[in-house]
C-alpha cells in the first residue's frame, strides 16, 4: 500500500549517509514537485516553464557542451514525465488516494467525506490556542467530532487539550530523541549497527513528520501512527523493539573487534 511504500522510501536517507550521491534526493524532489504542479495547472504551462528554465540555464552554461547535454536530457525526461502524470494519477492510484490528494491540493472541498477528518482536526488544533483547553476538556475530541483521534489523528487531541505549548514540547521531545539516535549511530563500530541506527531514526522521523502533516493538512491522509503515542499494541511493540534492538547494539559496541 501507499503508506508502506513511503515508509520504505525514507531509507534513501540512510543510503545518502552511507555515500549515495545527493543527486538522487534532488531528482526525487523534482519528481514530487513536477507531479504536484502538473496536477494543479495545465501540463502545457508546466512544459513552458521547463523550457524557460532550460533556456536560462543554457544561456548561463554557454559553451560547456557536457553540462548542456545533461540539461537537455533532463529536459526531455522531465517533459516525458509530465505527460505520464495524468495516467499515473487516474489509473495507478486508488480512488480514495486520488480524492485525498485533490482535497489536499484544494481541487475538491469535501468536508463531509474525504476532507472531514482533516477539517475537524484543524478546528481542534486551532481551538486549543496557546495553552489548550485542559486535559480531557477538548470539545472536538471529547464529543468525537474527530474520527481516529486516538490513533492516526492523536496529535489534534494534544493540540486541543495542551495547545501550542504542549505541541511544541512534543516536537522538541521527538527532535531530542532523533538527535540522540543519530549521535549513537555515529559512534557505532560496525557498519550494520550504524546503518540500523540511522534506519530507526529515519523511520521515527518519517512517521512523526507525516502524522503531524496529516493533522494540519500538509500531506494526504495515509494512516500512519504517531510513534509511542498513538493507541495500538502492534505499533507500540514495533517501535519499542526497533529502539531496544539498537540500544542493545550500542551497549555491545565495545565488544566488537
Residue ranges of model-derived segments:
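A juxtamembrane structural motif centered on a specific transmembrane helix
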Residues: 211-257
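Hydrophobic alpha-helical transmembrane segments
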Residues: 162-178
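Loop-to-helix entry and N-terminal half of a specific, functionally important transmembrane alpha helix
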Residues: 182-222
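Hydrophobic, glycine- and aromatic-enriched re-entrant/interface helices and adjoining loop segments
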Residues: 38-164, 191
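Interfacial segments of multi-pass membrane proteins
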Residues: 6, 11-27, 140-163, 226, ...
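Alpha-helical transmembrane bundle and helix-membrane interface signal
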Residues: 2-73, 85-92, 187-189, 246, ...
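Alpha-helical transmembrane segments of multi-pass membrane proteins
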Residues: 5-12, 172-175, 199, 236-243
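Transmembrane alpha-helix boundary/anchor motif
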Residues: 80-83, 92, 96, 173-180, ...
Amino acid at each position: 500500500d501507499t503508506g508502506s511504500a513511503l515508509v520504505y522510501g525514507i531509507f534513501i536517507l540512510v543510503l545518502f549517509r552511507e555515500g549515495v550521491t545527493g543527486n538522487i534526493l534532488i531528482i526525487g524532489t523534482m519528481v514530487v514537485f513536477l507531479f504536484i504542479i502538473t496536477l494543479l495547472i495545465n501540463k502545457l504551462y508546466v512544459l513552458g516553464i521547463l523550457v524557460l528554465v532550460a533556456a536560462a540555464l543554457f544561456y548561463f552554461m554557454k559553451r560547456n557542451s557536457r553540462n548542456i547535454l545533461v540539461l537537455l536530457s533532463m529536459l526531455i525526461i522531465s517533459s516525458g514525465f509530465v505527460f505520464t502524470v495524468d495516467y499515473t494519477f487516474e489509473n495507478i492510484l486508488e480512488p480514495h488516494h486520488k480524492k485525498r490528494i485533490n482535497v489536499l491540493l484544494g481541487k475538491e472541498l469535501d468536508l463531509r467525506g474525504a476532507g472531514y477528518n482533516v477539517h475537524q482536526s484543524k478546528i481542534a488544533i486551532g481551538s486549543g490556542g496557546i495553552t489548550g483547553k485542559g486535559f480531557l476538556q477538548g470539545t472536538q475530541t471529547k464529543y468525537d467530532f474527530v474520527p481516529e483521534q486516538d490513533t492516526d489523528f492523536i496529535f489534534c487531541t494534544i493540540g486541543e487539550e495542551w495547545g501550542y505549548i504542549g505541541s511544541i514540547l512534543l516536537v522538541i521531545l521527538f527532535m531530542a530523541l532523533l538527535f540522540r539516535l543519530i549521535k549513537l549511530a555515529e559512534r557505532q563500530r560496525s557498519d550494520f549497527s550504524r546503518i540500523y541506527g540511522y534506519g530507526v531514526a529515519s523511520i521515527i522521523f518519517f512517521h512523526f513528520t507525516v502524522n503531524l502533516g496529516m493533522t494540519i493538512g500538509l500531506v494526504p491522509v495515509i494512516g500512519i501512527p504517531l510513534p509511542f503515542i498513538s493507541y495500538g499494541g502492534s505499533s507500540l511493540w514495533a517501535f519499542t523493539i526497533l529502539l531496544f534492538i539498537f540500544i542493545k547494539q550500542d551497549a555491545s559496541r565495545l565488544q566488537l573487534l
